[in-house]
Structures are given as C-alpha cells and as structure tokens.
Amino acid sequence: MSLIASDHFRIVVGLGKSGMSLVRFLANRGVAFAVADTRENPPELATLQRDYPHVEVRCGELDVEFLCRADELYVSPGLALATPALQAAAARGVKLSGDIELFARNAKAPIVAISGSNAKSTVTTLVGEMAAAAGKRVAVGGNLGTPALDLLSDDVELYVMELSSFQLETTDQLNAEVATVLNISEDHMDRYSGLPAYHLAKHRIFRGAKQFVVNRQDALTRPLMGEGQPCWTFGLSKPDFKAFGLREENGEKYLAFEFQNLMPVRELKIRGAHNQSNALAALALGHAVGLPFDAMLVALRTFAGLEHRCQWVRDLDGVGYYNDSKATNVGAALAAIEGLGADIDGKVVLIAGGDGKGAEFKDLRDPVATHCRAVILMGRDSDKIGEAIGDAVPLIRATTLVDAVAQCRAAAQPGDVVLLSPACASFDMFNNYEDRGHQFVRAVEDLA
C-alpha cells in the first residue's frame, strides 16, 4: 500500500530525471497531479506528453496562482527553494516536498543514506557492491544513477542512497537505518548564503536515523541532534571502540576495526589516502547494517573506482595520468591532491579551473605548495585560483584541455602524476564534468 493520500492535488515542479520519476510514481498510484517547469522545453517534456498526455503541464515562468492549486509541491532538486514563486506558495500554506521524502515514506527495506561534499558516489557504489557480495538484494541510486522512486520494490532488501544537499532540503524525515555525512567543505555557495546554511541542509540526512556514521577527522560531520543512537566512526588515525581506521604492523598499513586488522592497504585497487578513507567509511556503513566482513573485503579488493573520480588513464614516460573531473569543488580537489601526492615519489602536475560557483580557493595554496610541481590553469575562474595559489608553484595558462595536457607533459618528470582535478564546475567550457573528463582522456590517449 502506498503511503500517499489520494484526495490531495499535487504539482511536480521540475521535469528532469527526478521529476519524471515523480510523474511515474504518482500516475501509477492514481494520484491527481500536474507538472510545472521554469524552462520552456524541459528535458523530459516529450516523454511526459507521449506517456501521460492528459497531465496538465505549464512551462516557463512559474505561476503562483497555479502552484497554489496544489496541497503539496514536489520540487526537483535543481530548483532553489528560495525561488520567489515557491516562497509565495509556501507562505499561502502549500507544502514543499521532494522525491526523497516520498521515497522514505514508501520504502519497506532499511536505507543506508550517504551525503557529503565529496566521495558520495564512490562510497555509495562501494557499499552497494559490498551488499551484493553479501548476497543482499540491494538497490543503489538517488543522486547517483537511478532516481529514488524508480528503485522502490517489495523485492529489495537494502537501499543504498546517495543524497545531495538539494535533495535533503525537501526531506523532513528520512528515517534511515544508518546515515552519514562523509565530509563538509564549501560547495554550491552560489545557492547557499554560506557554509552554515549548506551544513544544515546536509545534516537533515540524520533526521529519524537509527544509527550514525561520523568522520572523526571532520567535526562538521557529527550530527547536530541525537538521542543515544549507536555511532560508528571512521578516519585515517588508529581506531578504538566502535571505530574504523588504519593500523600499522611490521611496516605494513592495514584497514582496521577497533583492534582487529582487516586487510592490507596495498590490496586496495583505489589509490590515495582519500580512497583509504572512503573504504573505511564504506566498511562502517556496511557493518552498521550487518554486512559480514568477509563479503565486504571481497568487494574492497575488487573495486577499481568510478569514472572521473581519480580514474587512472595511462602511464607514459614514467608519468601517471589521472582523470578527476568530478572534483567540482575545492574539497574534492584537495582530497585528490593530498591523497595522490602522499602516495607517490614524485610531484603532482595539476590542471585546475572552470566555474568556481562562488567558492574561495585559498585552501588550495598550502597543499599545492607541498605536493605540486606546477599548476596549469584554464577556464572562467582561473585568475581567482592563480591569485589564491600565488607564487607557491609555477602557474601555466592554457586555453584548451588539449593545450593543458601538452603543458602537463612538458612540465612532468618521471615519478610524477598529471591530475585533472579542477576544483570547479565545467559549464563554462564543457557540457558537464563527464564531457570534460572524456575530453581529457582523449587528449591523454592521443599523446605519442
């Protein structure tokens, strides 16, 4: 039985991927609804008109009077809740909600809920693979891959969900079995008033959670609320009670739980300290929902990482080339620079720049000075990054990604790595971060 009242009228606001999943969910349950989108030709309009021709749809500027016909608006995550028409509707008593809230009301299996500024997709995918290795019927999605509502099934034994701050803004009570915010650093400052507002949005993931997983190296990940729920921690330090971390024995580093060594770090296919942290976070989440260590370790030993996330491309003349195009904020770039920088004998030659989304870049200076041989700058906010780094290392300008890769090859020495980790969004020069990553890979593969 669907936990949704059928006597109310709803409007889906936003007709992208998640909006279309809402349309399917509501239509399949016979719920009365309409659709609105600020764009004249939203991405899923043709699909809506083909499959649901009787659903009313309004495209273009949002009409407050139209929105106020609804008892509830399901707002897609791409649309800011501060949009004046949405605020006007809310002021007149219309409830603002979203697909994750609706998913949580209807999910019958436990939910592993994962957010954070960085590493969400890697950890979400890894926990999903751990659950599959343990023989669980697992569904993985949310902000990653399949929209949440399309995952709902009576056959699912465990949901593993990546959730963005935008999705969490419209989620009142997730009621996850275990929830985590992996890390917090500035991101989406073009949408939030500052880090505190972004932090509060992320922490909505903990509402109703039965267990927490906390990064003990990032105080901002600790829940702001709690009533004695079990709390597991992860970090790169030595673990103690209810903690996952790193232990060293006879010169060998191990992933460990409490006082038990689980596996040598060298057996991980994913490189860098940041990926060791990701592995520990996944172990903590899996342990919280009862996944056996033997199955989780099988998944860890075979997991090779995700495309565009510190993805190894090739080695050439003693230099490794890595595609980290998904690093669309400073925190993600720092994780890659520090993680790879500490894992190699040489230095990092970094490609950075793009649309900075209003972020500050000053935190790049010291890690760049420590780990980088040179920085190749490109894109809209390259000057801002250059000002933040200053004279810490040589700065080289490039106008295209092909030019940037050529400059990297000239600057790199054997033992170095070339790293595309832009610390910026891609839309100033590319269709999306995937397009940027694919162009980088092609440029690297074309090197003779």
From Swiss-Prot:
The keyword Cell wall biogenesis/degradation applies. It catalyses: UDP-N-acetyl-alpha-D-muramoyl-L-alanine + D-glutamate + ATP = UDP-N-acetyl-alpha-D-muramoyl-L-alanyl-D-glutamate + ADP + phosphate + H(+). Its EC number is 6.3.2.9. GO terms for biological process: cell division; cell wall organization; peptidoglycan biosynthetic process; regulation of cell shape. The keyword Ligase applies. One of its GO terms (molecular function) is ATP binding. Pathway: Cell wall biogenesis; peptidoglycan biosynthesis. This is UDP-N-acetylmuramoylalanine--D-glutamate ligase.
